[in-house]
């Protein structure tokens, strides 16, 4: 049995040697030879350079991206600075307009009042301490006409600028428009709780009360204060 096994091993060795000789005769390296291992090693090393070239390529890509981002940041910074400057200019113009509105907001009203002042000045010129007694009647007539003209002009100016006079006789008492001075007994035809007498007219500007009318309000006799 041992002889048979030895003979089989010898046969296999002979076949392997014959196969190796035939492989080398054709110039092919043996699969397990040193040359084959060296060639395989070189092939493996030949794949290493891309790994060595990898970092520089990635670094260049990052640099390009960084430059691009830096330009974008600079562009955004310039835009932001311009926007801030525009906002500041708008704020200054708005503030200037508000200040001008405060100063010149009543310019038109004052211009119309100047005409009233002219009428008043001409009316006072009609009065003279040295006027003769026979001229006093004529002077009073001129003053009266001047005062009527002055009143008409004032009403026209007030209406033009939305200023409305409040004379609320007979109206129901409203604390938002009337200032109560006292209560008076309700007379004939006068309803309790209504304005019986106006001591001082009130005024509204474009529907907003700027001065309350000073009034006396009617009440029933037993509730008189």
Swiss-Prot record:
GO terms for biological process: protein folding; protein import into mitochondrial matrix. Its main location: mitochondrion. It is found in: Mitochondrion matrix. Keywords: Acetylation, Chaperone, Mitochondrion, Transit peptide. InterPro entries: GrpE, GrpE_coiled_coil, GrpE_head. It holds the Pfam family GrpE. The modification N6-acetyllysine is found at residue 142. One of its GO terms (cellular component) is PAM complex, Tim23 associated import motor. One of its GO terms (molecular function) is adenyl-nucleotide exchange factor activity. Residues 1-32 form a transit peptide. Essential component of the PAM complex, a complex required for the translocation of transit peptide-containing proteins from the inner membrane into the mitochondrial matrix in an ATP-dependent manner. Seems to control the nucleotide-dependent binding of mitochondrial HSP70 to substrate proteins. Stimulates ATPase activity of mt-HSP70. May also serve to modulate the interconversion of oligomeric (inactive) and monomeric (active) forms of mt-HSP70. Belongs to the GrpE family. Probable component of the PAM complex at least composed of a mitochondrial HSP70 protein, GRPEL1 or GRPEL2, TIMM44, TIMM16/PAM16 and TIMM14/DNAJC19. This is GrpE protein homolog 2, mitochondrial. It comes from Pongo abelii. The gene is GRPEL2.
């Amino acid at each position: 049995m041992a002889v048979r096994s030895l003979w089989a091993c010898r046969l296999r060795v002979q076949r392997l040697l014959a196969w190796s000789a035939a492989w080398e005769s054709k110039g092919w390296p043996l699969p397990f030879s040193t040359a084959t291992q060296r060639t395989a090693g070189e092939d493996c090393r030949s794949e290493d350079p891309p790994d060595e070239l990898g970092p520089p390529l990635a670094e260049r890509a990052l640099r390009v991206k960084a430059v691009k981002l830096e330009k974008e940041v600079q562009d955004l910074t310039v835009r932001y600075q311009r926007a801030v400057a525009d906002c500041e200019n708008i704020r200054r113009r708005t503030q200037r307009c508000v200040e001008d509105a405060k100063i010149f907001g009543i310019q038109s009203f004052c211009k119309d009042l100047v005409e009233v002042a002219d009428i008043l000045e001409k009316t006072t010129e009609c009065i003279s301490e040295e006027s003769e007694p026979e001229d006093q009647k004529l002077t009073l007539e001129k003053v009266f006409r001047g005062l009527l003209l002055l009143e008409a002009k004032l009403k026209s100016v007030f209406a033009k600028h939305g200023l409305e006079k409040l004379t609320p006789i007979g109206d129901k008492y409203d604390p938002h428009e009337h200032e109560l001075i006292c209560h008076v007994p309700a007379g004939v035809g006068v309803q309790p709780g209504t304005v019986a007498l106006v001591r001082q007219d009130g005024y509204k500007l474009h529907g907003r009360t700027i001065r309350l009318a000073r009034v006396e309000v009617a009440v029933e006799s037993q509730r008189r204060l």
